[in-house]
């Protein structure tokens, strides 16, 4: 794939394409040795793009569908919002930004079942947090799942599906501790595909709920397991009927 991209762009002026792969190939072929990456780095990043762009979104959609299937009241609220904005037409980019109820449902599902359960970061400069000294180059694990399920932040109902906790935004939901909600990370190294993922999920849910009502199959066995991302060990069985 990399060789095909290089061959396709041969003869172009300063360009291997404007997508992620093109930018990586450009850095790989850079004349600046300080910024150049190796072929192994390039391949590793391509793997990251695949996992982050496919597995995590699939996982997120799976748990959102489960939450909607087991909470019919919220499913109806989201469906009514979709029909009010789009009717039976395809979702528009302008419209999906106004799906407030759906956004609440998505965020609450991501809180309960974040696709990525933890983040790894390397400390670039030694720092001190209270009495804790964190030296330079130490690898720090940020436990997203633990933060998402901390009752001191979210309250005693932390294990319940309550999308209305996000009714006034993440800051209000986390008691002004927005770093406690990390489905896509945070800061300069957060997920570059965050907005794309949100839009992809909203469009998919809109087109499903416009047409179908979802209920949980009695064959479903709840058993979340970590395989790249959190997913149902035995799959998700649902019943779908036309609205």
Pin down the residues of each PLM region.
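Central I-helix of cytochrome P450 enzymes
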Residues: 27-83, 109, 135-143, 182-183, ...
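Conserved cytochrome P450 K-helix E-x-x-R motif and the immediately C-terminal K′/meander segment
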Residues: 30, 89-130, 141
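Cytochrome P450 heme-thiolate monooxygenase catalytic domain
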Residues: 1-29, 70-81, 101, 105, ...
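Cytochrome P450 heme-thiolate "Cys pocket" and heme-binding signature region
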Residues: 47, 52, 90, 118, ...
